[in-house]
Amino acid sequence: MPIAIKNSKIDITSEKRTKELAKKFTKYLKGGEFVFLYGEMGVGKTTFVKYLINEYQKINNLTQTEITSPTFSLLNEYQVKDIRIKHYDLFRINSKEDINNLDIFEKDNKLITLIEWPHLIVDKQDIKFITLTFNYLNQLNDRTVDIKV
């Protein structure tokens, strides 16, 4: 992962900066990764995912589709050429058993798994994961994301 992203705190106050970060992130994710997205409601997790998936569509000459939060469906899935992207939102999940029933930890080198609200996931062994923690600063005016690889 480029040094500008790995284990760093990045300003994403504007949507433009969020989009730029998502674009950089696509150069790192090749398949087989799990990305955990932490942060309060409305801080930019789904916006980041939208720009990330749209960038994959763009670089593969595909029509950019509307990317929405899977808060109610729990999962939205996208096929981008030979890469599948699963976008989970676990906000409404209340137990570890419910997480186990979702079969989130499918291991596939052609799959990128993005998980919002991963707080109940405790058994992270045997998976390669990246943590993005989105934060508000200055009474919600500014935002940052901390990236841990």
Where are the model-predicted features located?
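N-terminal pre-Walker A segment at the start of P-loop NTPase domains
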Residues: 2-24
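Hydrophobic anchor at the beta1->P-loop junction of P-loop NTPases
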Residues: 35-37
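P-loop (Walker A) phosphate-binding loop of NTP-binding proteins
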Residues: 40
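Conserved lysine of the Walker
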Residues: 45
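Conserved nucleotide-sensing/catalytic segment adjacent to the nucleotide-binding pocket
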Residues: 68-71, 75-116
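Short phosphate-coordinating micro-motif centered on Lys-Gly-acidic
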Residues: 95-99, 105-149
